[in-house]
From Swiss-Prot:
Methyltransferase as UniProt keyword: no
The entry's keywords: Cytoplasm, Nucleus, Ribonucleoprotein, Ribosomal protein, RNA-binding, rRNA-binding
Gene Ontology CC terms: cytosolic large ribosomal subunit; nucleus
Function of the protein: Component of the ribosome, a large ribonucleoprotein complex responsible for the synthesis of proteins in the cell. The small ribosomal subunit (SSU) binds messenger RNAs (mRNAs) and translates the encoded message by selecting cognate aminoacyl-transfer RNA (tRNA) molecules. The large subunit (LSU) contains the ribosomal catalytic site termed the peptidyl transferase center (PTC), which catalyzes the formation of peptide bonds, thereby polymerizing the amino acids delivered by tRNAs into a polypeptide chain.
Subcellular localization: Nucleus; Cytoplasm
The protein's assembly and partners: Component of the large ribosomal subunit.
Primary residence: nucleus
Originating species: Eremothecium gossypii (strain ATCC 10895 / CBS 109.51 / FGSC 9923 / NRRL Y-1056)
Protein name, entry field: Large ribosomal subunit protein uL5
Single GO biological process annotation from the record: translation
Pfam families assigned: Ribosomal_L5, Ribosomal_L5_C
Amino acid sequence: MSAKAQNPMRELKIEKLVLNISVGESGDRLTRASKVLEQLSGQTPVHSKARYTVRTFGIRRNEKIAVHVTIRGPKSEEILERGLKVKEYQLRTKNFSETGNFGFGIQEHIDLGIKYDPSIGIYGMDFYVVMGRPGGRVSRRKRCRSTVGNSHKTSKEDTIAWFKQRYDADVLDK
C-alpha cells in the first residue's frame, strides 16, 4: 500500500473459479472427466448439455458433452495457484476480457499434482476466473437492485495490474 490508505471497497477479489472439461461426447470419457474434477475440487461436477446438433462432430442436442465445477473462497485461490504454476505465471493480454475476468487452459491435469491413474487417462481443462469488488452484489440481487458505477466496475487494466502484483506474473502482448 502507498502512504495514502486505499479504500477497502476498491480491492479486487476472486468471486469464483470455474473449471471446465469439454469432452465432446457422453459416456465413459465424460464420467472419467467428472472423476478428475471431483478429485481436484472435492465437489460434485455438473454436466453441460449440447445446445444444438452438429452432425459433423456427432453431437446431438441436449446430449451431455462437458463437465464443470464452480469453486469459491480460499480453495479457488489454491487451485488457481496450481493452474498458474503449470502456465509458469505467464498469460497473454487476450486471456483477459473487457469486464475484468480471465481464463486459460492446460493440456494435462496431471501437471496440477494429481497422481496419474491409467483407468482415468489424461484430460485438459479450462480455468475461468470471475473477478469482482465488494458491493458488486447490488447489481445481481433480486430485492432493491441497483447499478454499479463505471468507476467501480472491474476493467481489463485493473485485473492485469492485480494479476501482476498478486502473483508476480508476466502478461505477454502477443
